[in-house]
């Protein structure tokens, strides 16, 4: 089916008055940082990428590579360094802030820090030390609707965080540029009902990752506007893949499923396409939609999906004059 126009938000923070505005092209944004760039022989200053996941994954690698190539073509002189937080499942979430500060402290000459992924965003935006708040930062490759990373005293399997707008937290930090997106749950519900007007129940699947829990929190926040729809949350923090499949077989009639993400289950086991295959066989008559593009084209009927691609070129044109 033909998809609606994707929605993508690009934002910049003016340092003096802290007001947000939508931007398309900002070639002069970082003039104070790059107009007097030194040669590598004169300075060890660098641009530091901090990725939430392995930088060798195609999506992350392509965006970093596009940035570096275009940055050089536009005359950038600073070296680019990539560090990886190696974030996986939520069982290690309490370590993420310490992992991030170790990376930042390792690179005191970073002229600019580029945070890629929700784990990196949320970890950074909950650092209280003023030295981190003053770092010039770009944020990309994550939804604006995130969660607070749990503290040591919080049991991750029962943690029920509210969805928070991370772009609001950015006002306390030196975030110069933010490329983000937002899942439009209202449009997804509208699409489901247009196909299945008898829909009475929503099934939402999410996994044992930061993105999974952030998506679940965002869906919960939106579903309060639909009291007529009951909801089942199949949660990878408490479910193995087999347990999730069994729960899917027992959903009420007139249910419609909305896919978030299922990459890692409660045991920390990582799944690729085999999880989609298992879910699709569990309840073949259940209509399925996707808010993340997962399974669209071979299992999910459709969904209102943000635009994820093209981040590299957007960032690099704001990094060099």
Each language-model region and where it sits:
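An alpha-beta-alpha
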Residues: 47, 166-222
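Venus flytrap/periplasmic-binding-protein-like
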Residues: 136-148, 273-299
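Bacterial N-terminal signal peptides
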Residues: 24-32
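Periplasmic-binding protein-like
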Residues: 49-50, 106-117, 136-140, 201-206, ...
